[in-house]
Amino acid sequence: MRLRHKPYAMDRINEYSHFVIGNPEERAGNWKEVFGNEQPIHIEVGTGRGRFMYDMAKANPHINYIGIEKFTSVVVDALDKLIEEELPNLKLINKDAEDLTVFFAKGEIDRVYLNFSDPWPKKRHTKRRLTYKTFLRNYEEVLVEGGEIHFKTDNQGLFEYSLMSMAEYGMLLTYLSLDLHNSDFEGNIMTEYEEKFSSKGHRIYRVEAKYRTEPMQ
């Protein structure tokens, strides 16, 4: 995806620092204070233009959401949604998710969403996939005991790789769909990419995976 440069982006982000948290590492362990309540916290890694996080936060005011996106020219679009209609249970982070364990304390997050992540199809780029074992380890570090990952993609190769990676890591697959939009799954909230790809007839894959609280026998 080619990103269009937006020279105003950083100024906009700095102006609305109560929406886009500038130094998330300083908030580690204190995110409930940021939100001002004790509600569970769900994060999306690679939140893009923010439609999924925004719609989730609007539909579930009893849950706090944090969207993480490293590209400034993209996260500013998510910010614009918040400027237009503020949601008290949604914050954004404009940083690389590789630093996830610096942003959050151990057990501070209840769920991780991965939606239409870059498939990085070349073998030499395997370690960049957001379901590679080092990322799975980072998610486990910040999640509560028995925390979950919810993953969606239209890329069959990435989906198959992710199932294998999660299984090898010892995770328990609690929900699996090979064709989400033709399944009985209720309450699906689409991303921008999901709407685009499904309208072209692409099959959408979805899995929910849970970290085990006890070692595998």
Swiss-Prot record:
**Keywords, sorted A to Z:** Methyltransferase, S-adenosyl-L-methionine, Transferase, tRNA processing
Q: What is its EC number?
A: 2.1.1.33
- Chain positions recorded as S-adenosyl-L-methionine binding sites: E44, E69, D96, D118
Give the positions the UniProt entry annotates as the active site: D118
Record pathway:
tRNA modification; N(7)-methylguanine-tRNA biosynthesis
Catalytic activity from the UniProt record = guanosine(46) in tRNA + S-adenosyl-L-methionine = N(7)-methylguanosine(46) in tRNA + S-adenosyl-L-homocysteine
Recorded GO molecular functions are: tRNA (guanine(46)-N7)-methyltransferase activity
What family is reported?
Belongs to the class I-like SAM-binding methyltransferase superfamily. TrmB family.
Kindly provide the name given to this protein in its UniProt entry.
Answer: tRNA (guanine-N(7)-)-methyltransferase
Origin species, per record, is Bacillus thuringiensis (strain Al Hakam)
